[in-house]
């Protein structure tokens, strides 16, 4: 887990929470939508662990106390998933040798990650 904390390191004095207990359904997309909120508690290694095991759904603030970022992510969620062409994005990343790591999201979209060696 230390490797995960190292690459997803950012602001450690607060983090985002996606609370699924009172989730609503988005009428436009039909997708479940959690109650998003911000908590001003320490983002501890245990919180990371709870996220990785699925106990909590949290989000790290990528910028640290100095406003520097070590990672970033672009979240691509198309309006219509049926005709979503992931291959276009994958080929574009390869064609231009972009330093992005594409991961399919739970919804079927894409998350494009960018990592820096240091702040």
Where are these regions (language model features)?
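Histidine-centered divalent-metal-coordination microenvironment in nucleic-acid enzymes
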Residues: 74, 99-119
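DNA replication initiation on ssDNA origins
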Residues: 1-71, 79-89
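Helical (often loop-to-helix) elements that flank the catalytic cores of nucleotide-handling enzymes
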Residues: 82-95, 115-119
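Short glycine/proline-enriched loop/turn "hinge" motifs that connect secondary-structure elements
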Residues: 61-67, 94, 101-106
């Amino acid at each position: 887990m230390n490797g995960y904390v190292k690459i997803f390191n950012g602001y450690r004095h607060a983090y985002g929470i996606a609370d699924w207990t009172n989730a609503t359904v988005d009428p436009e997309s039909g997708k479940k939508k959690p109650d998003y909120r911000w908590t001003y508690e320490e983002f501890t290694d245990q919180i990371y662990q709870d996220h990785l095991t699925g106990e909590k759904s949290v989000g790290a603030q990528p910028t640290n106390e100095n406003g520097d970022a070590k990672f970033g992510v672009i979240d691509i969620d198309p309006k219509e998933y049926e005709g979503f062409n992931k291959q276009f994005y994958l080929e574009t990343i390869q064609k231009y040798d972009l330093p992005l790591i594409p991961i399919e999201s739970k919804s079927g979209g894409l998350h494009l990650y960018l990592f820096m060696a240091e702040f």
